[in-house]
Amino acid sequence: MPSTLTINGKAPIVAYAELIAARIVNALAPNSIAIKLVDDKKAPAAKLDDATEDVFNKITSKFAAIFDNGDKEQVAKWVNLAQKELVIKNFAKLSQSLETLDSQLNLRTFILGGLKYSAADVACWGALRSNGMCGSIIKNKVDVNVSRWYTLLEMDPIFGEAHDFLSKSLLELKKSANVGKKKETHKANFEIDLPDAKMGEVVTRFPPEPSGYLHIGHAKAALLNQYFAQAYKGKLIIRFDDTNPSKEKEEFQDSILEDLDLLGIKGDRITYSSDYFQEMYDYCVQMIKDGKAYCDDTPTEKMREERMDGVASARRDRSVEENLRIFTEEMKNGTEEGLKNCVRAKIDYKALNKTLRDPVIYRCNLTPHHRTGSTWKIYPTYDFCVPIVDAIEGVTHALRTIEYRDRNAQYDWMLQALRLRKVHIWDFARINFVRTLLSKRKLQWMVDKDLVGNWDDPRFPTVRGVRRRGMTVEGLRNFVLSQGPSRNVINLEWNLIWAFNKKVIDPIAPRHTAIVNPVKIHLEGSEAPQEPKIEMKPKHKKNPAVGEKKVIYYKDIVVDKDDADVINVDEEVTLMDWGNVIITKKNDDGSMVAKLNLEGDFKKTKHKLTWLADTKDVVPVDLVDFDHLITKDRLEEDESFEDFLTPQTEFHTDAIADLNVKDMKIGDIIQFERKGYYRLDALPKDGKPYVFFTIPDGKSVNKYGAKK
C-alpha cells in the first residue's frame, strides 16, 4: 500500500526537501508515495501517513535502497545542518552555515562527493529553496560553490520543477475550494503578507526628509518599499517630507535622488509634502471647527512637563472661534501672537500612550522654504502631515521603522478624525550598527565640529560615506535585501556588510603591490637582471579578464621592513610572482644581499614576500585607515555620545606602490597584496601623493576600519 505525503503549501518553511525526496522515490518506484497538498497555516509542514515528526528521515529510511549512496554519519550531519541552520532567517548565522557548505563543495560536485547526489544534497537544497533569504545570495553568487551546486541540481526536473508542482497543486486546491477571488500569490523573499494587499493595487512610499544625506537605514527603507511595490505589481512614490524649512536644503534633496538612482531605485512618482500645504492647512481648519484641535501658547518646557505628567493645558478649552482666529489670522501671518502659539490635536491628555497626549500638529516658522519661499509662515508636523499625504496620494501600505510603533495609534487617529481612508502600517526594524550614529542631528554635529570632512566622510554611515570607503552598490544592495523586513531590533557588526562587499570585489579587484618602510635587497647571480626589465603579468591570477600589468624585474629590490625583520641569513624565502631567493647577508643598515634560486620550491618556504624593483618608477602613496567615531557598541538612552568619542579615528601610512597605479582613476578598487583592499580617493596634488582608503574585508578583527 503506498504511503501518503502531505505537504502544507502555507507552512512558514515549506517542506521542499520532503517533496523532492518523494518525487525521487516515485521516479524510480512509481506510485510509491501519494503526494497531497493542503493550504492551512496551522497544519504541520509535512506529514508522512500519520507521522509529523522527522518526515524527511522517515522517507529516506523507508526507501533506503534508493538513498543508500553515502556514509550514514555524514548524511545525518548534513541533514541536521539543513534542518536546523539553513532555514534560519538570521543573516549572520545563515552566512556561517553557507560558508561551511561552500567549503565542503569546494572541488566536489555533490556534498559527499561522487557522481550522484545523496540525501544530504536533497536536504540542503530543499532547505535553501524554502528559505526566502537565500534567493538573492544564490543569484548573486555570494558563495560561489553553493551557487554552482544549487544551479546544477535545479537543472534536474525533480528539483527544479518542485516549485511549479507545488504552485500548480496549490492553485488547483484553491480553485476547488472556490477561493480564486483572493489576492494573487506572489513570490516574496521576505515571507510576509501585507494586510489587504491586492495585486496591481499596492502603493508604497519612501518619504525622506531633505535635511541630510541618505544613510544605510534609509537605504533599507527605500529598498523594502521598492520590493513590495514590485512584488505586488504596484507603484512606489518617492516623497520628500519637506515640512521643516529650518533644516532642509535643495542640496540634500538632489543628493538623495542621486543616491537612490545609484541603488537602482526609481519611483513611479516624485512628490513633495509641500505640494499639499494648502490641503493640510484646510484639514487643520476642519479639525479646529470639529473641536478636535486647539491653539496653545503654553511655554515649550511647561508643555513638555504637562504632557509627561498627563496634565491638561490651560488652553485646551479655548473656543472654536478663538482657535480659528489665532490659527488663520495670527499664526498664518506669523504675527507676534501667532509665533507664541502652536496647534495641538485634542486627543487624550491622560492617554497611557504618551504620543496621544495632545501632540503638536502645526508650528510657526519664519524661515523661507526652499520650494515655496515665504508663502507660508506655518508648517505641519511630521505626525500630522504623513497620514494626510499618504491618504491623498493613494498610499495603501506605509512601511515604517519599528521605533514609530507607539505613533501608529496617532497616525490612525488623524485619518479617522479627518474622515480619510485607512492606510495600513507595516513595521520593520531599522538597521543599527555597533559604534555608529545614524541620527542626522548627531551626524550634523560631527560635521559642524570638524570631526569629519563632510557627509561623504568614509567614517559616516551615509550611502556616500560607505561608498567612498569602498562599498559597492551591488554589495550594499545585496546586504540590505538580505536583512528583509524583520522586526527584530539588533545591533549588527560592520563585518557583515563588508563581507558582502568582499564577495563582489574580490573576483574583480586588480592585484597591486605597496611597500611600507622599504628595505633594500641586492640580488646576486646571473639570473638577476642588471638593467630594469619589464614583463606583462595578469592583474588577477584567477581572472584574466581583469587585464595585465607591468612588473619590473631588477637586481635591486625593496621589501617591507616588517618582512625584513623576520627573515634570517641563510633562509630561503619566496618573492611573489618571481621565485625563491636565499638571504646571504644582512648589513648594519638593515639592507640585505640575496642569491636568486628560481628553481627552489615555494611550497617549502615559510615567508612569501611582496617586493618592488628599486627604481625611479615607484609611486608614493598614502594608505589611510579609519576607526569608528564612538568607542561604545551601543549607547544607552541616558548616555551622551559626546562622552564616547574615539580620540583618533584616522591613520596614515606612507608607502610606495608599483607604477601601474598611475593608470588608475578616483574610485577604482584594488588589492594591495598581503595588505588588503583599497579604493583610490585622491590623485597627486600640491605635492601630496595618491591617497588610498582601506576597505574592510569582513573579518571580525577589522571591524569597519577599527585598528587591530
From Swiss-Prot:
Region Interaction with ARC1, annotated ranges: 106-115, 141-157
Location of the protein in the cell: Cytoplasm; Mitochondrion
Extent of motif 'HIGH' region: 210-219
Residues with the Phosphothreonine modification: T300
PROSITE patterns per record: AA_TRNA_LIGASE_I
Alphabetical keyword list: Aminoacyl-tRNA synthetase, ATP-binding, Cytoplasm, Ligase, Mitochondrion, Nucleotide-binding, Phosphoprotein, Protein biosynthesis
Protein name listed in UniProt: Glutamate--tRNA ligase, cytoplasmic
